[in-house]
Amino acid sequence: MKLLKILSLVCLSISIGACAEHSMSRAKTSTIPQVNNSIIDQNVQALFNEISADAVFVTYDGQNIKKYGTHLDRAKTAYIPASTFKIANALIGLENHKATSTEIFKWDGKPRFFKAWDKDFTLGEAMQASTVPVYQELARRIGPSLMQSELQRIGYGNMQIGTEVDQFWLKGPLTITPIQEVKFVYDLAQGQLPFKPEVQQQVKEMLYVERRGENRLYAKSGWGMAVDPQVGWYVGFVEKADGQVVAFALNMQMKAGDDIALRKQLSLDVLDKLGVFHYL
């Protein structure tokens, strides 16, 4: 009888010890990602602290929305899309046969806002150079009625185009939030927008920026100069080697004279710190 009691006490002691060790192990493993995430957040925040601008950087991996920056409320605030609307414009135009991906849009010989725009472009080339007149011509071909119905069909932003079919994304009334932007480009990356698969693939290829290892970056910039305060965008997604897609949207207040390359550079720096698109 005494032997049974001794054995019972030994087993109980071992069981308690094992449970305590398991609890300590769980506590240790659960704190590691929290520390890492905290360090990552601090490193990203340091990037935004270096710039004197209201800004937010939003990421979306198909499940989670994350926000970084100096003014996180901008993530849910609507702004004109500026040239990031070229993505939707191209999708609508190609889907409705208003242009092809190989068509040459001829320059009319008149000086444009940037001298680099004074030449012929395909839609893809105009996407890369952000050539506004080419996409204004595409919008005029689409026309106000079709443009309005298409924006409603795909649920783009506030779906308002007003009376000027070649100005509404530059001056308003069309607006979109950074969260809406990341979800839109995420669906494009996955081929899940309500457009033909081949159309989505064509537009996706127009957005290609660079490759690092097996990871690929696709993006479009935007600068709304016709509104006050001015707004800057850098919107896109990274396709990682394992097939994961991470969409992102930088939205920031800008002013005349700001560095035109800041939006892209800041986005690349943030993506690097987040471990999404590392510098090699």
Swiss-Prot record:
The keyword 4Fe-4S does not apply. Activated approximately 3-fold by the presence of 0.1M NaHCO3. It is found in: Cell membrane. Its EC number is 3.5.2.6. Residues 1-18 form the signal peptide. A beta-lactam binds at S83, K86, S130, S221, W223, R263. GO terms for biological process: antibiotic catabolic process; cell wall organization; response to antibiotic. It is a lipid-anchor. InterPro entries: Bact_Transpept/Beta-Lactamase, Beta-lactam/transpept-like, Beta-lactam_class-D_AS, PCN-bd_Tpept. One of its GO terms (cellular component) is plasma membrane. It catalyses: a beta-lactam + H2O = a substituted beta-amino acid. Keywords: Antibiotic resistance, Cell membrane, Hydrolase, Lipoprotein, Membrane, Palmitate, Plasmid, Signal. GO terms for molecular function: beta-lactamase activity; penicillin binding. Induction: Expressed from an upstream promoter, P(Aba2), in an insertion sequence, ISAba2. Expression level is positively correlated with gene copy-number in clinical isolates. A lipid is attached at C19 (N-palmitoyl cysteine). A lipid is attached at C19 (S-diacylglycerol cysteine). The active site is at S83 (acyl-ester intermediate). The keyword Signal applies. The modification N6-carboxylysine is found at K86. Class D beta-lactamase which confers resistance to the beta-lactam antibiotics, including penicillins and oxacillin, and moderate resistance to carbapenems such as imipenem; in the DH10B strain of E.coli. Acts via hydrolysis of the beta-lactam ring. Has benzylpenicillin-, oxacillin-, cephalothin- and imipenem-hydrolyzing activities. PANTHER family: BETA-LACTAMASE YBXI-RELATED, PEPTIDOGLYCAN D,D-TRANSPEPTIDASE. Monomer. Dimer. NCBIfam families: bla_class_D_main, blaOXA-58_like. Belongs to the class-D beta-lactamase family. This is Beta-lactamase OXA-58.
